[in-house]
Amino acid sequence: MSPNPQWDVPRALRVARLFHLVCGVRDACVTPFLTLYLRQLGVAAPLVGILMGTKHLIATCWIPFCAFLAKRYQKRRMFLTGSLLSSAGASLLMVLVPPVDRNLVNHFCNGSSRVATTILPLGVTQTVIMTPTQGSGAPNLPGSRHTRALDTSGFPNGSEGTFSGLQTYLVGSVEGARTTTQGLHLVTSGLRDNSQKGTFEVGNVTLNLLPGSTALGGPVNLSKPQGDTQTPDHSSKGSPWTFILSLGVVVFWELLAAPLEQVADDSLYEYLDFVDATDRNRDLWVWKLLGVSAGVCGIAALVGHLECLLVANGPQGVIYFYSYSLVSTLALAVSTAFPVPIDQQQGPSYKAIKALSLIRGDSRLILLAFTVFWIGATASTVQDFLFWHMKDHGSSELVMGFSVALSLLGEILFHPFRTSLLRKLSRVGVLGLGLGCLALQVLYYAFIWSWWSVLPVQILSTISSGALWWAVGASIEDLAFSGMERSLGTMFRGHFYGSGCSLGSFVGGFVVLHFGIAVLYEACCVVLLLWLALFLSIQPRLPQEQRINYSKLLAMGGSDSSDSEQGSEGDWLVKAMREEHSDWKG
């Protein structure tokens, strides 16, 4: 078959690796920062949860349908090209969504200093206590772009002078801001000058601005950094059109972009399966993670240093979508050489139905499905609101991107120890260890105290994400019938994990609104620990039936060169069955 250029396997693998690398960079441009951008627009936490939950739900239901259509009508190349091209255009629609305050501009791009574009929600009334400071004011937190100490030492004495100085500072520190009925309004019902205590008090200051990380609900000492006062408010009373338009754009965008990965994976798998080389595509996920790691740091650095130069007006973060569109165009060029099998007329496949039937008939798979569901619910809360939490503590986008890259690189570096870890601890042991590390990780997120404090715990992602999914994959391979491993894996990652992500987003937004982000992560920790205890108590009581994977046995038999050995010790079938028994016993 080598003369046929359609089956050039080395070339196909090189193109597939490059495609996964570019797609990883593409996803990293927007996916980690989407909820942070929605916060910049003024969308409240529960609405962000609804939006992200809808996004996950669409992906869960829409991807299998598109994959079926692409295979049934042999239109995979069309799906790949159409998804990349249309999603590149759809991403730019997000730039057109207006913020809650239509007068919002990039106020931090004033040439000399940076001031937050995300500020108080519409109609928030707050009492402000200003304490004089020495020098030019408290310094900014390292890496922070949205906190700034307010220097009141230059304000004149007297009530009228104090209010005038306050108004001049708040308006003047935001270069080019407009003081209109939709912009900044300072309404005072009382002003007191306490010169003996050195404190100026402004009563009932109403700031009609956008939601952000300024502490609400009580007196605030503005001589301190913003993140040190109270829990930020995550509600918004602005126009619902921002949410409605954002929801419409995200739904449309997801319908176009979601099928890409599944259609590409199916195409490559069938291409390699025709020449019995499917085992050679198992390292492609490494290239995807490398792309995400590089992309998330690159886009964060780009936003931090070039956005003021490239985007003068509009909310902070629009460059995410321009970058996504640009990288999608690059991926479109690579996709023209992506391996797609042709003239493979096959009958209808019912592997999804068979996979559901297999799960329903095996209690161990049912338990594993619930485990993956809770993993998805927890992961979505981290994806949706961890960057909010970091932003409230002064983290910049570069620190956020580095935290994501650190966790992904840890998974890649830890992968060579996969086999030894699964052999020493067994699949059940690694699952329990992964759930415990995930619970510890989200509990740590609830108590972060500084802009850098989230970085050390990211090393736990090697276990809470990497090893946990290795154990899930190994369990699926051992519990599935021959030829059903891939269908089961797709169902677990697509349906059960996606459904958990959807539920976590829906519930997480309302928990953040009423209790705060820290309470959300504490609740996730409690749920994971309860499920871990239930999992470890139920697992030993389930029937431990041995299911021989004949494809694995044949692979072992083909590589066994000791057929001439005497006795059962030289029998490859006996060796495989003993290893299978020892794994389940462990």
UniProtKB/Swiss-Prot annotation:
Where is the region Disordered? 218-237
- In its keyword annotation, does this UniProt entry include Magnesium? no
The record's section on InterPro entries has: MFS_assoc_dom, MFS_MFSD6, MFS_trans_sf
Does this entry carry the keyword Hydrolase? no
- Write down the superkingdom of origin: Eukaryota
Question: Where is this gene product found?
Answer: Membrane
User: Transmembrane region positions?
Assistant: 50-70, 78-98, 240-260, 284-304, 318-338, 365-385, 397-417, 428-448, 454-474, 494-514, 519-538
| Topological category with respect to the lipid bilayer | Multi-pass membrane protein
Gene Ontology cellular-component terms for this entry are: membrane
| Biased composition annotated in UniProt, kind: Polar residues | 223-237
Q: What is its main location?
A: membrane
Q: Which UniProt keywords apply?
A: Membrane, Transmembrane, Transmembrane helix
Q: Which family does it belong to?
A: Belongs to the major facilitator superfamily. MFSD6 family.
What protein does this entry describe? Major facilitator superfamily domain-containing protein 6-like
